UniProtKB/Swiss-Prot annotation:
Organism: Dictyostelium discoideum (Social amoeba)
Zinc finger (C3H1-type) in chain: 114-140
Residue stretches of biased makeup (Polar residues): 321-336
Protein name: Uncharacterized protein DDB_G0272420
Cell compartment(s), UniProt: Membrane
Extracellular-facing ranges: 23-339
Signal peptide boundaries: 1-22
Gene Ontology CC annotations of this record: extracellular space; membrane
Amino acid sequence: MKNIKIIIILISLIFLISISNSEIFGRSEQCPLISLLKIGEDCQSSSDCEYPNICKNNKCQEIVQVGDPCESDEECGLFFNNIGKCISGTCDINLKNGDDCGEGHSGTCGEGSVCKFYKCVLNNGNCTSDSQCPFNHYCEENSNTCSPVVLGNQCDRDSMCPITHICQKNECVAKYSRETATPCGGNPELCDVFNGDECDKVHKICRRNDKYGSECYVDGDCGTGVCMCNNDGHKQCVGSNTTLVHDGCLQAINSFVKCMKDKRCSSVSPLTCKDCYPIWECYRYNCFASEHFDQRKSAYYKSLKCDTDVGSLVNPDAANPNYNGGSNRKTNQKRSNSNSNYLISLSLTLTLILILLILF
C-alpha cells in the first residue's frame, strides 16, 4: 500500500510540473516592452535611443548631417543602406554606381567608381558582382558589365529578374502569384504570403496557413510560419519570412518600382532617392513583422506616416474577407480556454489528492 501511495504521489507531481509549463496559464510567452530614450537622455549604446538617433558621449543625439564633422560611419546614418559615410572626419554621401554626382550634387562616388559626365561609373567599366550595379541591373558574367534586367530573358539567379520577380527554372516568375493548392517548388516567395498562404516545405504546394495572427509560444505553433514578439508584448504567428497578412503589399511594391523608374533612381536611399525611399520603408513596415514589430523603429515609421490599422495586419478577416483565419482563431481561442479551464480544475483536484495522501 505504501509503495502504491508513493507511486501515485510521484505521478501526480510529474503531471503538475508539466501542467505548470503548458497552456493553462496562457502559452503565449510575454515579451519585454522596451523604453527608448529621447535626444539628450543618458545612454550606453545606440540601441538605447529612438531610431534613427545614436548614442554619442553617453547621450542620445541626432545623426550627423552631410558636411558636418564626424568620428564614425554610424554618426552619419549607417542604417540608410550604408550610404552615409564618415570620410576624412566629415559626413558625406557614399554614392553608388549610376547615382548623379559632380557639380550641384552632394556625395562622393564609392570605392571602385568615379564621377564621369555627372554619373558615378565603375573605374574600368567592369563589374564583379551584382551589388555594384544600379537598381534593376545585374552584372553580366560574360562581359562583366552592368546590364538591365529584361523580363522574358533566361535567368540563373534572382538578381537577373525585376525586384517583383524571382528566378524559377531559368525563368523570371512574378512573386506571390501562385494560387492556393498550386506548386511552389519549395520557394516561399511564389505563394501569396500577404494573403495568408505559405509554401508547404514537404509537398511543395501553396497552402493556407490558418495560424497567421494567432498567439504562440514557439515556431512549431505556427505551422510553416514563425513565432515573433509583437508590439503588445506577446508572441504571435507570422509568415516564414516574417510576412504579415495585408492586402496592400503588392500594390506597395509595384508603386515603389514605378517610382524608381519615374525618378530614374539608381539606388534606394533617403538621400539620393528621397521620393521613393519612404515608399520602400513603408512597404517593409506594413508587410513584414521584422520591421512592424521593431519597437525601436516605431517613432521613425510614424514620422514616415506608415501607420496602418494593426488589426488589418494581424487579423486575416480584416485583410481578406474570403479568408477564414479570423474565425479559426476565435474557435481555437475558445477551445484553448476550455482546455485551460479543464486542466486547471484537474490540477487543483490532483493537488488536493496529494495533500490527503501525505496527511493520511
